[in-house]
């Protein structure tokens, strides 16, 4: 007798998170570590829990995440996106509240590339008229 599993893939910046939701107690495991151990910043852990807060399902599902690429902020955003997509599979009625909170939209902002002749993406060396 296997439990129902719900999957979702989330992306943010260079991070990609594959998320599985299993009915349980609300335990979040990221790359086989506890979320408090893997993500040290409390504000980023709040970001991860946003989809549950919006849908009033806090503590209803255990979350297993495999995330690669990016840093803490990008990975947290990717996990949030993946959880929101997985919650859609749990109950399609969540779509309206998740969409209104902006959790289903892929944040397309990425690091702008460095241009030749400039020091960074937009920073130029100081201009001298004479």
Curated annotation (Swiss-Prot):
One Gene Ontology term, aspect cellular component: cytosolic small ribosomal subunit
Domain of life per record: Bacteria
Residue ranges of the region described as Disordered: 106-130
GO biological process: translation
InterPro entries, per database record: Ribosomal_Su5_D2-typ_SF, Ribosomal_uS9, Ribosomal_uS9_bac/plastid, Ribosomal_uS9_CS, Ribsml_uS5_D2-typ_fold_subgr
Family statement: Belongs to the universal ribosomal protein uS9 family.
Protein name (Swiss-Prot/TrEMBL): Small ribosomal subunit protein uS9
Gene source species: Streptococcus pneumoniae serotype 4 (strain ATCC BAA-334 / TIGR4)
Gene name in the database record: rpsI
């Amino acid at each position: 007798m296997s439990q129902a599993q719900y999957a979702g893939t989330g992306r943010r910046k260079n991070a990609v998170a594959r998320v599985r939701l299993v009915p349980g107690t609300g335990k979040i495991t990221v790359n086989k570590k506890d979320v408090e151990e893997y993500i040290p910043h409390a504000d980023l852990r709040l970001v991860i829990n946003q989809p549950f807060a919006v849908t009033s399902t806090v503590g209803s599902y255990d979350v297993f995440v495999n995330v690669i690429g990016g840093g803490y902020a990008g990975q947290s955003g990717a996990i949030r996106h993946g959880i929101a997509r997985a919650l859609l599979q749990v109950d399609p009625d969540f779509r309206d509240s998740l969409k209104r909170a902006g959790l289903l939209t892929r944040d397309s902002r990425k690091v702008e590339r460095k241009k030749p002749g400039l020091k960074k993406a937009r920073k130029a060396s100081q201009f001298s008229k004479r």
